Amino acid sequence: MLKAFKEFAVKGNALDMAVGVILGASFGTIVKSLVDDLIMPPIGLVLGGVDFSNLFVTLRDGAAPGPYASLAAAKQAGAVTLNVGVFANTVVSFTIVAFAVFLLVRGVNTLRERLEGPAAPKQQACPFCFSKIDVRATRCPHCTATIG
């Protein structure tokens, strides 16, 4: 049983999947930092100094009445908040990751098409009646001529 598990774990699919999950998590962390630290601060500055990580709407005050200076202060007071800024950061992060995955898949598909070459035709024209027939056919179903 241990030998079978070792063979499964070392084979390409399980190992490739593990590497993909680890790299995906690391890439997600990098994108989160990119959004939180490099993209959203200039956007917030252009929009009048808005700090997106602290952009929230208080739905119900907590133990201490609002307004709260930050999202952390609202959470500490037990307020119920709608975290609009955190959601905006998450949407931007998702968009970047989705676009990166799209580019990766598109590149892999293009490379695969170049390596495999054009697909073999599945149909041919009958040399007698010019009808489309399967390339494996030995007799034309339209004119009954023998092919081949």
Curated annotation (Swiss-Prot):
TM ranges: 15-35, 84-104
Subcellular location: Cell inner membrane
GO cellular component terms, A-Z: plasma membrane
Record has Transport as a keyword: yes
Gene3D superfamilies xrefs: Large-conductance mechanosensitive channel, MscL, domain 1
Highest taxon of the lineage: Bacteria
UniProt key word Zinc: no
Keywords assigned: Cell inner membrane, Cell membrane, Ion channel, Ion transport, Membrane, Transmembrane, Transmembrane helix, Transport
Predominant subcellular localization, coarse grouping: membrane
Recorded topology in the membrane: Multi-pass membrane protein
GO molecular function, a single term: mechanosensitive monoatomic ion channel activity
Pfam families from the UniProt entry: MscL
Subunit and interaction comment: Homopentamer.
UniProt similarity note: Belongs to the MscL family.
Function statement: Channel that opens in response to stretch forces in the membrane lipid bilayer. May participate in the regulation of osmotic pressure changes within the cell.
Protein name: Large-conductance mechanosensitive channel
Organism annotation: Nitratidesulfovibrio vulgaris (strain DSM 19637 / Miyazaki F)
Gene name in the database record: mscL
